[in-house]
């Protein structure tokens, strides 16, 4: 199956801050991941094995928006124990060519 989509540049749309957030949880991680995925600023959620139970990618307007998202939405979710935020400084490579090899 092939799907053709347009990929926008968040910077060009006024979203100057992107970050990856590692989330540690207690309880049903699938339910927490679904709640994280429902947040408007979240564009990627994956359940993982290792240091984090979930990894979340967010796109925010600025650092204040990121801080608000962390404090009032992500960390406020029942079952979220802690987070670790990795702020993107520069996107070096991003490609969408799965299945073209």
Region annotations inferred by a language model:
Residues 1-101:
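A compositional/biophysical signature of low hydrophobicity enriched in polar/charged and small residues
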């Amino acid at each position: 199956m092939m799907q053709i989509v347009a990929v926008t540049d968040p910077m060009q749309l006024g979203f100057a801050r992107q970050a990856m957030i590692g989330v540690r949880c207690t309880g049903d991680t699938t339910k927490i991941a679904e709640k994280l995925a429902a947040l408007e600023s979240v564009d990627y959620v994956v359940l993982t094995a290792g240091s984090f139970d979930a990894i979340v990618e967010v796109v925010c307007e600025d650092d204040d928006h990121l801080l608000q998202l962390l404090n009032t939405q992500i960390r406020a979710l029942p079952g979220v124990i802690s987070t670790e935020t990795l702020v993107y400084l520069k996107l070096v490579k991003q490609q969408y060519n799965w299945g073209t090899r």
